[in-house]
């Protein structure tokens, strides 16, 4: 990563720490934002499919994590930030403009709606989701957006046995599978909780009935007993 990209990442951390119109990340501490959020987002690049992606969708982008750091690191990729909350989407547009990121667009809509939109359904090579929801919910949000053979990078903390089982059932229904998992180990001076990256692969076309109606995936997770 070149000096320009590193400068942009530092500038982005500054935008997050100084923005006053909405609480987009939960902390205003610049150092914490840079270490625990911006740099953590770059751990997605441990997966080769993301490094080679040409069209990336960041689901539930919030303050732009991991989407904006990835857009900085992957200037040849088209990155779409999906965010349903208006004030957060407003910040995303502001940050994209301030950082001069010509390869990023912001979509302010519920992800269930976007995933049924022909402009987005089946169009992405990689989707990302950082600490968003259970694997089953992330799968229902993201697999419809992917082309066949595409991948999801789910940035998770601890995943218990029930979540793995539920996620496996959901993936079978949606036409996907877990293809890889990485435990991220940080340097001792970086205060970071457990970070697990789960790579999902879309192996079959997702049935047209998914995702279900807005709010249903979160209220009634696919694969839950």
What are the functions of these language-model segments?
Residues 1-57, 87-104, 213:
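Class I SAM-dependent transferase core
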